[in-house]
Amino acid sequence: MVSDEDELNLLVIVVDANPIWWGKQALKESQFTLSKCIDAVMVLGNSHLFMNRSNKLAVIASHIQESRFLYPGKNGRLGDFFGDPGNPPEFNPSGSKDGKYELLTSANEVIVEEIKDLMTKSDIKGQHTETLLAGSLAKALCYIHRMNKEVKDNQEMKSRILVIKAAEDSALQYMNFMNVIFAAQKQNILIDACVLDSDSGLLQQACDITGGLYLKVPQMPSLLQYLLWVFLPDQDQRSQLILPPPVHVDYRAACFCHRNLIEIGYVCSVCLSIFCNFSPICTTCETAFKISLPPVLKAKKKKLKVSA
């Protein structure tokens, strides 16, 4: 049996840093801005690290152009994750100016530095304005897989992903998103979702399939309270708490032709691609369907009457 000392708990937080959505929030003169969202994320991360000294944290920003690790930063190494000697200043600072726990202070500084660099140096070009959420989740899974390889023989690591979603879903990412969901399910990784704006059908499916929690925040300025109440406890602790009831899951699929969510469609019998309109040839695997037509009845010849 693995003791609490040997059980690692990794929390990967994926933050939606879509500059267009957050820019619209700023134009509305909203009380809730990206900086306040990052502040709430840092408090959640600090609380997670403070719950147990074996708890681990990673934060990923999901932008419209890239997915970037906010923590650990660019100078982080695999050895640093498990407390090996030779840590850089990012993980083992020489001292804390205000007496705070050094790891919490360094984590906050790295997150603030990385998010500022991401938002100031990004140059928005073209028509692509959708958050690369599927890629960020794939990056989180790769990170968890890499960390699992570094776990010692006498240790066990439980991992979960928390997505803080702001912008709307992207139907173009449907296939990649579903692949990520089933990969997480196979690795027993929970996906939780905290949605700030409109509901996300894709994240509802992700939470339902992996056993995570889905919550649409009623009031965005109260984000921190919901993060600490709902998403700070791990899977074992949640059974002892009164949490929001599960929501109705929208299991509509996106068609491969127009990426629209549909309830009834045509499915290719070879590659299982979904289409909203019938096509004699599958555009995915180029299979030609044999169309069974009704039998054609030959017209009966009329008998000519012979005149007497």
UniProtKB/Swiss-Prot annotation:
Q: Where are the zinc fingers (C4-type)?
A: 268-285
| Localization (cell) | Nucleus
Coiled coil stretches, renumbered:
none
Alphabetically sorted, this entry's keywords are:
DNA damage, DNA repair, Metal-binding, Nucleus, Transcription, Transcription regulation, Zinc, Zinc-finger
Quote any Pfam family the record assigns: Tfb4
Its primary localisation, in coarse terms, equals: nucleus
Which GO annotations describe the biological process of this protein? DNA repair; nucleotide-excision repair; regulation of DNA-templated transcription; transcription by RNA polymerase II
GO function terms (MF aspect):
RNA polymerase II general transcription initiation factor activity; zinc ion binding
Cellular component terms (Gene Ontology): core TFIIH complex portion of holo TFIIH complex; nucleoplasm; nucleus; transcription factor TFIID complex; transcription factor TFIIH core complex; transcription factor TFIIH holo complex; transcription preinitiation complex
The record's note on quaternary structure and interaction partners says: Part of a TFIID-containing RNA polymerase II pre-initiation complex that is composed of TBP and at least GTF2A1, GTF2A2, GTF2E1, GTF2E2, GTF2F1, GTF2H2, GTF2H3, GTF2H4, GTF2H5, GTF2B, TCEA1, ERCC2, ERCC3, TAF1, TAF2, TAF3, TAF4, TAF5, TAF6, TAF7, TAF8, TAF9, TAF10, TAF11, TAF12 and TAF13. Component of the 7-subunit TFIIH core complex composed of XPB/ERCC3, XPD/ERCC2, GTF2H1, GTF2H2, GTF2H3, GTF2H4 and GTF2H5, which is active in NER.
Family the UniProt entry places it in: Belongs to the TFB4 family.
Q: What does this protein do?
A: Component of the general transcription and DNA repair factor IIH (TFIIH) core complex, which is involved in general and transcription-coupled nucleotide excision repair (NER) of damaged DNA and, when complexed to CAK, in RNA transcription by RNA polymerase II. In NER, TFIIH acts by opening DNA around the lesion to allow the excision of the damaged oligonucleotide and its replacement by a new DNA fragment. In transcription, TFIIH has an essential role in transcription initiation.
Q: What is this protein called?
A: General transcription factor IIH subunit 3
Source organism of this protein record: Homo sapiens
